[in-house]
């Protein structure tokens, strides 16, 4: 099927001007995830904040009740007993100076990054590499911690980091098209709840302004913001 015809087909039945209840939006998106691979279901939340101001930054981490459906590779910067704990918890890559050198050389074999507090002077050198990828460990989201085992298990088990982008948007994957619709709805509501709890003091007016759900290759479906709470 030609790409144009395919896009026309999957867009049929979606009113681009309508705001759908969350459960209906998820159903529409799932029905149109027709690729040969298991597409990721993604959510975009437009917030009434200006992240250029420090008091309007929104970031955090949420444990999705039904996981993400992704295999997440976790890297841990730790030494000694903490390194052993990380390995036992299932970390894919564990190291100290050696791991710093690997990352500096461009070998990033992980999707999420965790560090013990004592490692941060070393890990701080990697800001230019890990920062743009959104992978820099941060105590505010639990990725700089002495509980490396808990952090590794969380990352593997469905925790999702979120951070508002320059345009005031938070985007996150909340599961796979193969998930039951009610499981996706639960995950989306958990994300929205975490975003609400992370509302900064500097936010004025309507906080959650627009919400849309889509699949990797499918069209976006606009959601009634009030139905995600």
UniProtKB/Swiss-Prot annotation:
CDD domains: Ribosomal_L1 (cd00403)
Assembly behavior: Part of the 50S ribosomal subunit.
CC per GO annotation: cytosolic large ribosomal subunit
GO biological process, one term: regulation of translation
Summary of the function given for this chain in its UniProt record: Binds directly to 23S rRNA. The L1 stalk is quite mobile in the ribosome, and is involved in E site tRNA release. Protein L1 is also a translational repressor protein, it controls the translation of the L11 operon by binding to its mRNA.
Protein name: Large ribosomal subunit protein uL1
InterPro entries in the record: Ribosom_uL1_bac-type (IPR005878), Ribosomal_uL1 (IPR002143), Ribosomal_uL1-like (IPR023674), Ribosomal_uL1/biogenesis (IPR028364), Ribosomal_uL1_3-a/b-sand (IPR016095), Ribosomal_uL1_CS (IPR023673)
One Pfam family, short name: Ribosomal_L1
GO molecular function: rRNA binding; structural constituent of ribosome; tRNA binding
Family to which the UniProt record says this protein belongs: Belongs to the universal ribosomal protein uL1 family.
Keywords, sorted A to Z: Repressor, Ribonucleoprotein, Ribosomal protein, RNA-binding, rRNA-binding, Translation regulation, tRNA-binding
The keyword Endoplasmic reticulum appears for this protein: no
Domain of life according to the entry: Bacteria
Database matches in Gene3D superfamilies: 3.30.190.20, 3.40.50.790
């Amino acid at each position: 099927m030609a790409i144009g015809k395919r896009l026309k087909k999957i867009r049929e039945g979606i009113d681009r001007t309508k705001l759908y209840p969350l459960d209906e939006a998820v159903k529409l998106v799932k029905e149109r995830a027709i690729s040969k691979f298991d597409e990721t279901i993604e959510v975009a939340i437009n917030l009434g904040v200006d992240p250029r101001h420090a008091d309007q930054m929104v970031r955090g981490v949420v444990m999705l009740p039904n996981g993400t459906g992704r295999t997440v590779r976790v890297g841990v910067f730790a030494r000694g007993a903490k390194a052993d704990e990380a390995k036992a918890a299932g970390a894919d890559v564990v190291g100290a100076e050696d791991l710093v050198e690997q990352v500096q050389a461009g070998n990033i074999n992980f999707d999420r990054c965790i560090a013990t507090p004592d490692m941060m002077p070393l890990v701080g050198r990697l800001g230019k590499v890990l920062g743009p990828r959104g992978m820099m460990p941060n105590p505010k989201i639990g990725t700089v911690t002495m509980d490396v085992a808990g952090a590794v298990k969380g990352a593997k088990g469905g925790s999702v980091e979120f951070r508002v982008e320059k345009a005031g948007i938070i985007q996150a994957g909340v599961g796979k098209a193969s998930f039951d619709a009610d499981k996706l709805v639960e995950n989306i509501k958990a994300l929205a709840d975490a975003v609400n709890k992370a509302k900064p003091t500097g936010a004025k007016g309507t906080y959650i302004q627009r919400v849309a759900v889509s699949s990797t290759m499918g069209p976006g479906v606009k959601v009634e913001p009030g139905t995600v709470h």
